[in-house]
């Protein structure tokens, strides 16, 4: 006699699929899901830290209730601050980056206090085009140990914001072969600067002297850029001093060439009246204008 096999309620789905392969795969998936452990939900970082903290302190013997409560509040607050700081340092957002840049700009304009002209706030304000020019000037170096960005800028800006801010000294580093050669000697600030062009200022007012002769302009010769010429001499000398001009001769020459209303002409007639001679200019006859038709018909003027 064969024993009858009974199927449990969990395996009743095994008979729903007609195909054997489908039934077997369904059966295995059910078995795996029953045997696999349940997934626990992830706890929040804050909850996990606080729960572990309370478990540790619950094992310890009870002390005075007032002191314990105050201590627990301080510890929980400290843990919350640490967790908040960890979350803030993990990700860099756009707002955090903007705040950092604003801090850097403020320290560039206010907090750099050194004797270098290139690091001064006046130099920073004079550069109107780009901030990159200001940072490029900080690549200059007084000695070959470090440049101005590493010595001054890092001290007053980067390290003031974060003490762990690290910078690499490129002056002591050899240039690699695959980079374009740059003569780094150009970045060295000269120690001896010639100030001969600048006027030396007296420290005390009593030491100042004034020469009155240099202010008075008597017997002062003007400095000229052009060489001596006739046009330059005309400024000081009267024109036509060395040239004698006869005005009558000039007027007579004009009357001979053209009719001059201010002088006598050959066409004038002299008339005596009451012992005076008067020059009268005869009237001109108006010539009749002959047209083209009259010329063809040979019409006389009279």
Swiss-Prot record:
One GO biological process term is: spindle attachment to meiosis I kinetochore
Q: Which UniProt keywords apply?
A: Meiosis, Nucleus, Phosphoprotein
For this chain, the Swiss-Prot or TrEMBL PTM comment says: Phosphorylated by CDC5. This phosphorylation is required for the location to the kinetochores during late pachytene.
Q: Where is the composition biased (Polar residues)?
A: 257-268
Give a yes or no for keyword Phosphoprotein in this entry. Answer: yes
Database matches in Gene3D superfamilies: 6.10.250.3400
Q: Residues annotated as region Disordered?
A: 53-83, 257-276
Principal subcellular localization = nucleus
GO CC, sorted alphabetically, is: kinetochore; monopolin complex; nucleus
InterPro entries listed in its UniProt record: Monopolin_cplx_su_Mam1
Answer whether the UniProt record assigns the keyword Nucleus to this protein: yes
Which compartments is it annotated to reside in? Nucleus
Oligomeric state and interaction partners are given as: Component of the monopolin complex composed of at least CSM1, LRS4 and MAM1. The complex associates with the kinetochore during late pachytene.
Described by its record, this protein's role is as follows: Component of the monopolin complex which promotes monoorientation during meiosis I, required for chromosome segregation during meiosis.
What is the protein's given name?
Monopolin complex subunit MAM1
Species for this entry? Saccharomyces cerevisiae (strain ATCC 204508 / S288c) (Baker's yeast)
Gene designation? MAM1
């Amino acid at each position: 006699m064969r024993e009858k096999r009974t199927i449990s309620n969990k395996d009743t789905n095994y008979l729903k699929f007609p195909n054997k392969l489908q039934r077997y795969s369904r059966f295995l998936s059910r078995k795996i899901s029953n045997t696999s452990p349940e997934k626990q939900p992830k706890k929040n970082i804050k909850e996990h830290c606080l729960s572990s903290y309370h478990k540790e302190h619950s094992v310890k013997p009870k002390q005075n209730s007032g002191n314990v409560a105050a201590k627990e509040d301080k510890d929980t607050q400290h843990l919350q601050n640490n967790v908040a700081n960890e979350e803030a340092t993990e990700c860099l957002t756009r707002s955090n980056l903007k705040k950092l840049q604003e801090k850097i700009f403020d320290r560039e304009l206010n907090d750099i206090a050194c004797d270098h002209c290139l690091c001064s706030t006046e130099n920073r304000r004079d550069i109107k085009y780009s901030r990159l020019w200001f940072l490029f000037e900080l690549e200059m170096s007084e000695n070959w140990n470090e440049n101005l960005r590493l010595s001054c800028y890092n001290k007053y800006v980067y390290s003031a914001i974060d003490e762990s801010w690290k910078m690499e000294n490129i002056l002591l580093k050899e240039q690699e072969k695959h980079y374009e050669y740059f003569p780094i000697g150009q970045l060295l600030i000269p120690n001896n600067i010639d100030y001969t062009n600048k006027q030396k200022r007296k420290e005390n007012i009593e030491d100042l002297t004034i020469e009155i002769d240099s202010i008075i302009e008597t017997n002062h010769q003007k400095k000229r850029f052009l060489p001596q010429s006739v046009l330059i001499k005309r400024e000081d000398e009267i024109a036509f001093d060395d040239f004698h001009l006869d005005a009558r001769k000039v007027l007579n020459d004009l009357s001979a060439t053209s009719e001059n209303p201010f002088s006598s002409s050959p066409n004038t007639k002299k008339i005596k009246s009451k012992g005076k001679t008067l020059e009268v200019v005869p009237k001109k006859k108006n010539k009749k204008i002959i047209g083209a038709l009259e010329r063809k018909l040979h019409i006389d003027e009279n």
